[in-house]
Amino acid sequence: MPALRQTPCVAAALVLLLAALAAAAAEEDTVKRGEYLVRAGGCCSCHTAPGGQKLAGGRALKTPFGTFYSPNITPDPKTGIGRWTDAQFQRALRQGVSPEGTNYFPVFPYPSFTRITDSDALAIKVYLFSLPAVHQENRPHDVAFPFSWRLLQTGWKLLFFSPGPFEPKPDRSAVYNRGAYLVTALAHCGECHTPRNLLGATRSGQQLAGTPDGPDGELVPNITPDPATGIGKWDKEDVVEFLRTGMTPEQSRVKGAMREVVEDGLKYLSEDDLEAITDYLLAQPAIVRSVTRRK
């Protein structure tokens, strides 16, 4: 009889064990998915200083408005994001607002990240919180007045920020919409490949047309399908190969920031996602715009 009385206890213990194993497996899957999304988003390229620890920040980004330094996004509770709640993380990513309620400068690409889905945003957070915490103080930005005035960002948002999730086009294929999500939200390609106005907002009607004023003063090429000034002479295989390896059809290897984007992120993406990005890019309006260094 004692053995019979123990049977329900054993069964309950097995149920709890199986539930715990299932939860652990689900957590591991979320971490892996979050790592993939971080790769796609190019987070390591911006949030890791040369010779520094992964995602601990401190990388300088020179712009026409001054020099910005990326923050520590490891789970350190004092100098990183270790105390952030899910809601605070999503608000930062998708609204450009810190846990303290201040606006981030749009050098942080929240105008694109606003389109990221809830599930992707939380998977990114789960992955970041699985990493070792690095105690490294954030370096203050070196930005001239009036651009250094945080309150000015409120007006900037009213003029140029359109918050809201990604909305797939019902008349387009699933592949196109996946590519649109990757390009316009997660990988935020337009943040570097689109020219900006005097206030630092991307120019409407010039999406992906390139700019001579890229990060650190780099020339950022036109990636619309214009055959003369963009990638219009590239076929689908050319684009996929470039995204995977950084090699152009002319057999020259990409340099600068884009090399890091490929090495730290794009080369890890699935073939399906690389093809989706390609499908979207080649379906965009061709814009005639030669990108040359300013004299």
Residue ranges and their predicted role:
Residues M1-Q6:
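N-terminal secretory signal peptides that target proteins for export/translocation
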Residues V10-A20:
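Bacterial N-terminal signal peptides
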Residues L21-R39, K78, G155-T184:
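Electrostatic cytochrome c docking/interface patches
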Residues G34, A40-P50, F89, I124, ...:
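The canonical Cys-X-X-Cys-His
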Residues C46-G52, R94-Q95, F129-S130, C192-L198, ...:
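Detector for the c-type heme attachment site
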Residues K62-R91, P111-A121, Q207-E250, E260-L274:
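Electron-transfer interface patches adjacent to heme c in soluble/periplasmic c-type cytochromes
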Residues A87, G96, G101-F105, P109-S112, ...:
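Membrane-embedded segments
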Residues Q136-T154, R293:
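Extended, well-folded interaction surfaces typified by the phenylalanyl-tRNA synthetase beta subunit core
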